[in-house]
Amino acid sequence: MSKTNDWLDFDQLAEDKVRDALKPPSMYKVILVNDDYTPMEFVIDVLQKFFSYDVERATQLMLTVHYQGKAICGVFTAEVAETKVAMVNNYARENEHPLLCTLEKA
């Protein structure tokens, strides 16, 4: 008499689990979008506070946002990217600025 789980290939299930566990996570770009109202100093503050850039790099990125319309602040896993986007957008609203932070798949 056969067992009810003879049709299961436990070795294959284990291999599938290992392969899935070894897959790198999906990565997402966090992007700041230019607007005509947010002060440049505030954008620099955001880049330093939430992305740990020094003042020189934050200034370079702020100028990229200003002149090119947007800039990538970093590339992160989905959870980290979503958290950073929410934190930046909340901080901007708390300070009454329309600065927009978004994410897109890398």
From Swiss-Prot:
Quaternary structure and partners: Binds to the N-terminal domain of the chaperone ClpA.
Protein family per UniProt: Belongs to the ClpS family.
Disulfide bonds, paired cysteine numbers: none
Gene3D superfamilies per record: 3.30.1390.10
A Gene Ontology biological process term: protein catabolic process
Function: Involved in the modulation of the specificity of the ClpAP-mediated ATP-dependent protein degradation.
Alphabetical list of Pfam families matching this protein: ClpS
Organism name: Escherichia fergusonii (strain ATCC 35469 / DSM 13698 / CCUG 18766 / IAM 14443 / JCM 21226 / LMG 7866 / NBRC 102419 / NCTC 12128 / CDC 0568-73)
Gene that specifies this protein: clpS
UniProt protein name: ATP-dependent Clp protease adapter protein ClpS
NCBIfam families: PRK00033.1-3, PRK00033.1-5
